[in-house]
Amino acid sequence: MKLLLLALILVLSNINLISGNGLVWPHPRLPCSPYDERGCINTQKCSSTDCDSFKRRIYFDVAYNTAFTIYQHTIFKYYSANYYKVELIVGGKVYFIHKFGQFRGDDCEFDEIIPAFYKKVQFLDLSTPIKATIQFSFDFSSHPKHANIYYSCIDVWLFDSAYYNYCPTNSGGGSGNSGGSWSSGGSGNSGGGWSSGGSGNSGGSWSSGNSGGHSTGDCPTSSGGWTSGSHSSGSWSSGGGSGSSSGGQSSGSWSSGGGSSSGGHSSGSWSSGGGSSAGGGSSSGSHSSGSWSSGGSSSGGQSSGSWSSGGGSSSGGQSSGSWSSGGGSSSGSHSSGSWSSGGSSSGSHSSGSWSSGGSSSSSGNSGWMTASGGNTGGNTGGNTGGNTGGQSSGNSGWMTASGGNTGGNTGGNTGGQSSGNSGWMTASGGNTGGNTGGNTGGQSSGSSSSGGNSGWLTSSGSNSGSSSSGSNSGWLTSSGNSVSSSSGGNSGWLTSSGGNSGGNSGSSSSGGNSGWLTSSGGNSGGSSSSGSNSGASSSGDNTGGNSGWLTSSGGNTGGNSGAATGGNSGGNSGASSSGGNSGGASSSGGNTGGNSGWLTSSGGNTGGNSGAATGGNSGGNSGASSSGGNSGWLTGGVTGGNSGGATGGNSGGATGGNSGGATGGNSGGATGGNSGGASSSGGNSGGATGGNSGGATGGNSGGATGGNSGGATGGNSGGATGGNSGGATGGNSGGASSSGGNTGGNSGGATGGNSGGATGGNSGGATGGNSGGATGGNSGGNSGASSSGGNSGWLTGGATGGNSGGATGGNSGAATGGNSGATGGNSGGNSGAATGGNIGGASSGSSSSGGNSGWLTGGATGGNSGGATGGNSGGATGGNSGGATGGNSGGATGGNSGGATGGNSGAATGANSGAATGANSGAATGANSGAATGANSGNNAAVTGAANGNNGAAAGANSGAATAANSGAATAANSGAATAANRGNNAAATGAANGNNGAAAGANSGAATAANSGAANSGAATAANSGAAAGANSGAATAANSGAATAASGGNGASGAANPGSIVTPNDQNVSPLSNSDAAATAASTTGRNPRNPTSRAPTVTPTPTSSAEEPAAGGEDSSAISKYSIQSFGIFVLSMIIYLVI
């Protein structure tokens, strides 16, 4: 009896101290619910317990309000004195986030909204998700006998969607074999965008799943996330030499260069380069899904979503969504959605296959993955009106080209072909105004070729067939360009071996075609080239095409505008001229051609066809025709247009080119310049040694003192009236006809035609460039049968091609004199030339389409080349790229680009590559990287409308390479995209988010690491410092060396952005993606889906971490109420004990 009574006393005296509180959702370390109370009574702080890495699958967006479900098990009477507190733990530091009262005293579950707290964590670099822990504390310490504080912990990936959006729109899906856009599914429930699924529940965007049930990923708004496989998903691995990435769960791994990626569950692996994965190797496994394989073979039982480029084959029982380009075959019993170019796609269920080839030529529409929308309005409206009268060079895009050709081909292609407009990310509006007004006038009669349109991924069979299309480049391959027609050149991303070999072979020549990695066979072809803008008349032909990497909004704004009746005006008079090369009285639109760029090409042609005024492609393209090259992904920027032509044109021969005297180079008379005879398809082949180079000392050089130099007054100079000048109508004019000039837009033009020997050629005379001689530039040049403008590539080409390769020789000769002549360089060039130079009028014939530049440098390179003022790229005052005063690219005073001995600039040798030696990288010395001085570095004033960090050549591409201190993306302090305070100020990158530095989002300077920036290991470089980026120093670099560098610098340029969209899930001790139920729950719990405008964020504030001693004071009752409660409880206990003792 006494024992029972004693128990009752203890219960009565402690009745108000029983409590239990914790989180039900989202996924705490220890669950707390009516069914599992382990997490309800946890008294250890989160920092004292182990993180459950498996549950770190919540992506917590600080930009949104988020709901948390709390389970409260307490019978406190005075609950209003309690409060709950929310804190964030990052790197061992604790930060206060939110606090709210207990409010309720019953046993229940309820939801509490935690407001967005991005302002409280602005000091964190959330450009990519970081590990963090959210700590909920349930404080009951204000009650008698010091009740405990209970903790619930959630391990999350913290990110800010204002700068980092990891969730795609997952469209489509469903059971069966093929489900979902951007994806092809295998058996099971494959349905997710950007993915190809194996068996099981594979449906994740940007992923390919293996045969498991875990491949729905982390995105709460999609049925599939960014990951696939049960473990190790989405990992990036670049470089590694002979290393290997293999194992049972290697999924989504990137492997570039040398190594091998294989194993039982190798899914979504990227493999490029040597080793056993690409270039003749193989990527295989029992569940090889979504594998990228180039040149080799990808096979296995469930090979789904495999990419295969080259002569290999992709086959298997469930080969779905396979990409196959080239002579290979993609077949299987369930081959769905397969891409096949030039080969065969067959199977019992072959649906939605892409196959281009056969006898008809379609300029094709390439893109990176899809061109959804790109060709919707484009070829829909375009092919109806546009392609009716001719071929359309197609419209490509990297992500989407929606709207890109909507307005464009609709009005544009009505009368003839459109060179199309491509973009990397979006080309919305890119061709809206362009082809609308441009191609209306039925230009492109006769045999024409559009300036070509580059894409990012594939150019599936675009140029195959009997007709000529404006060339369509791709990202991976450009096979299928064989047959007898000429295309404006076709480039690829990985290889373009034979790219234009078969393609441009036969009777016509194309402006050469480069690739990403290699451009072997790039410029081979026949004796003639088709002109894109031929015909009776035309206005605003968008021949050159307007491509861009990220956005091309406004890409043709200045282009076809500035050129208006100018540049391309008088030019192709005579029988006909289309677009910028309109014939007769006037033309609008002008040289759409060189308006490309890597990041943005907004205003890309502003200076280009603008500055060129009536210069540019005017009078130029006399003779049969010349197609402006088409660039690709890796090499060539400037190399394009006037590049390819640069080789022929300014080169002609060592002494020919810009030098040679009156009959030399662009001058030489009618047949001189870019012509150099019946035809010259020098294009951009050979990289640095090709095109304008012909050898570092070749082409424009003809010898250091040869070519453009010949001495200060030699080469293109020859005296004021010499070289390109030759007199008012002399130089490149050589008489009535002029220009050919804008072959690569004003870009190629900058380098080639107008540049040729940049300095010499366009300079020598008067105010230089196309100015020098009134009708200078590519004037007289393109007479003769034809010349193709050459085609640039992705990475180096820029200065390397046209003005570069030749930059060394040609522009060197006379140091600053060369390109300078006057500091105008190409300034006076297309400008001074005014109605002179390229107007020349007389040239008729087919036409020439402006070239189209490539991916990285080409940007500014496109239009007037990197140099905002144009003429010559990069140079602040024009002249030749890079050089402060113009002169020759790279070196401050010119000479041989990159440095006196740069000779082989661009591609050249390692040491002098890119931009000379480390100290003098890019241009000038380290302090004066890019063009400007140290103080102005990154703000390359020459770049029209460019804001902080937008250096010369492209949107924000900081100095060519620069030294460690001033490397492309510079150090944290000098980062191209600036420090955290200046995040997202990359004005030129339209729509680019935080830290989209220069070339790509955070692509570290030229290539390289801080130590080896741009100079020593530039270009293709070694594996460690690879231009395309291998390993630790890959394009997007490591956190420490990333484009925008360290967190202290605002985290500009994270690796993910370098490959937009392919964001991977950070690996944390075998991270597992969310299940379907998790994803649904996450979606249901997120509120306020209207992200703020990143540009309106408050200034960066670094809060001081709070310790427990600094926590906000508890709210609730006053001390008197608590005392009364304590006395009451104590009284119950004493009274009970008296009763017990009496009994």
UniProtKB/Swiss-Prot annotation:
Cellular compartments per GO CC: membrane
Gly residues bias (residue ranges): 177-203, 237-283, 297-330, 374-392, 404-418, 430-444, 555-573, 580-596, 604-622, 629-783, 790-843, 851-905
Subcellular location, principal: membrane
TM helices/strands, residue ranges: 1122-1142
Intervals, Cytoplasmic compartment: 1143
Membrane topology listed for this record: Single-pass type I membrane protein
Range of residues in the leader sequence: 1-20
Low complexity composition bias: residue spans: 222-236, 284-296, 331-368, 393-403, 445-498, 506-541, 906-1059, 1094-1114
Annotated compartments: Membrane
Residue intervals annotated with topology Extracellular: 21-1121
Keywords associated with the record: Membrane, Signal, Transmembrane, Transmembrane helix
Highest taxon of the lineage: Eukaryota
Region (Disordered) location: 177-1120
Residue ranges with Polar residues bias: 1062-1078
Keyword Cell division in record: no
Record-given protein name: Uncharacterized transmembrane protein DDB_G0289901
